Structure formats: C-alpha cells, structure tokens
Amino acid sequence: MERSRVKYGLLHNHTMESRRDSAMSVQTLVDRAKELGAPAVALTDHGVMTGYIDFARCCEEAGIKPVVGVEAYIEEGSEGRKHLILMSKNDKGFRALSKFTTDTQHRLANGFARGNKELLMRYFGPGSEGHGNVIATSACVQGVLASIVLANRSVDDDINKLREQQDG
C-alpha cells in the first residue's frame, strides 16, 4: 500500500536545537518530510534559529522548500509565556525574524528567551521590515491564540454553571 503524500508543508517542527523538546536532527526532519512527500518543511525551534544553515542545505539536497521560522515565547503578564510560531516568507522576513530572535535572547526568564508585544510591533508591526514578510500562527495549546479559546471556554463553563445553579 502506497503511503499518502503530504499535499502541503509541515509547518511546526523542532530539532535538537529546541531545548528540552526534541532529539531529532535537522537531517532527520528533512528526510521524514521527503519520505512523506512534503513540498515544504518549516524549522520552528523554540526561541532559536541556530539550525537554519544546515536546514537550508538539507532541504536543497532533498529538493524541498525550506521555511525558516521560530516558535517564540511571548510574555503575557503574570500568566507566564505563550507560544507563537513566526515564519519568514522572504529575505526581509528572515532578517526581521533574526533580529527579533536575537533581541529575545537578551530577555531570558527561567532559561527561555522571551519576546513581548513591544518587540512584535517593532519587528513585525506596520512600517517595520517584517510587516507583511512574516507569517504568524498559533503554536499549540500554550499558544497565544489557543489561550484565548481556552479562556473563553472557561468563561462559557462558568456561565453554564451559573445557569445550572439558577435552574436548580
């Protein structure tokens, strides 16, 4: 039975450059993407872009489009850090993403580089080099967007409990 091919790129991937998250090498990631027939694959390590040179080389050798990105940690007040995937669309986006990631390294908390809304606006907001040149997506259940959904779910649960108490 032939394995089905991936029609789109694999866009949320970590390698051993991601602290405490993956033991996979860049080569293994690219080999797996090729095996699945993916036309593109993204490298979105946590808080760093240190593997992008090997990644680009491996992708070129495999005939796969490399998408360079990062899974950034964004400060959310006292709630700790939220995750946000940022991927460069082109050279301008790559430069902005590199500068953003470098600046987050100066803002460590518990060993993790952290960005904030100010840095996001500086590098990706209107009038910046990265504006329109970087794609942002929710990362995981700890992501910026997922946290909004989960917060709304919590509010909905509270409303339903109140209704049950009123009806009971």
Where in the sequence are the language-model features?
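Phosphodiester-processing cores and adjacent nucleic acid-binding clamps
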Residues: M1-G168
